[in-house]
């Protein structure tokens, strides 16, 4: 029975429809404080934010993921930006659950970036860059994945992983007090940082 919360943690974190991402307010930074109920984050621009953590909120830790782990038929979440010629270039690659809703939508990792949840149908290596062919229910997209593109994998974690100074990604919603309540958390671990 102890495995159930851990499995739910990964499924809740990974099975996100791209549409739902647009409804969240995402925060990226390092943990500045944590009292068991409220997480303080120093954001990348130096500002601070405090986020309520509801009881029972699953925590995901971060595990290393590399091109050697990528397999055809795997469902990936790939964040991209467009070059001037329209070519899509990956800035983040992560495996997600096979049951995750597939599609493409805007994402806030970088200005004008998009996220695609899709099945990897083909990959071609040219020099030090891979080209992914990603298929989802209503379309297909080709993405260049240069060597060194950030990659990571979400794995079950716990509140014990919420240590000061650790990198963290939090998806939140506005609450009735005009503050923020976390709906997902992924925290760095063993030197591996969230890439989304």
Predicted regions: what they are:
Residues 2-5, 20-56, 60-196:
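Short, flexible, surface-exposed loop segments at domain boundaries
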Residues 5-12:
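Sec-dependent signal peptide hydrophobic core
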């Amino acid at each position: 029975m102890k495995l159930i919360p851990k499995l739910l943690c990964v499924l809740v974190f990974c099975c996100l429809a791209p549409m739902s991402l647009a409804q969240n307010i995402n925060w990226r930074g390092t943990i500045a404080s944590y009292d068991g109920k409220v997480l303080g984050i120093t954001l990348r621009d130096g500002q601070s934010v405090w986020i309520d953590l509801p009881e029972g909120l699953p925590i995901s830790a971060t595990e290393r993921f590399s091109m050697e782990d990528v397999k055809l038929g795997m469902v990936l979440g790939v964040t991209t930006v467009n070059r001037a010629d329209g070519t899509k270039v990956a800035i983040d690659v992560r495996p997600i659950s096979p049951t995750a809703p597939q599609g493409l939508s805007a994402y806030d990792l970088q200005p004008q970036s998009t996220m695609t949840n899709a099945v990897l149908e083909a990959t071609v290596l040219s020099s030090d860059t891979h080209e992914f062919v990603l298929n989802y229910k209503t379309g297909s997209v080709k993405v260049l994945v240069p060597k060194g593109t950030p990659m990571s994998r979400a794995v079950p974690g716990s509140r014990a992983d919420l240590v000061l100074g650790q990198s963290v990604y939090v998806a939140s919603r506005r609450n009735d007090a005009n503050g923020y309540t976390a709906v997902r958390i992924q925290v760095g671990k063993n030197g591996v940082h969230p890439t989304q």
